[in-house]
């Protein structure tokens, strides 16, 4: 068995590690008939009778981190989190919610003054309240709700090298 980037993207699988990081990176897709569009728009569309020809990853990333929690090493993720920094702007994608990944930004500007443990915790708690989560066979909504701020906080601290 093997997975491909194109298959993961076109399938829009909620458990896709690849889709989560590409969403955080702000990737775009090119489809033979529909043309170029943001990956986030493609994931929300119902396009099924087309051909994915390219995945376009924009330049300018100054840092990125991906974290996930799995019940065991070979499982699909219970929850996935990718954080990308461009200049001083952060973009967070949360995947395996169990729905397809969705991106979030620092709407309240909590990260504008730099990352400390306290700021990372405050942002993680605030963001986790905005994330729509659900349950499935891998885990409950409650377990994902408890895990989300942990992954976001750890990701921010790792990205910025804060110990």
Predicted ranges, named:
Residues 1-163:
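C-terminal structural segment of proteins
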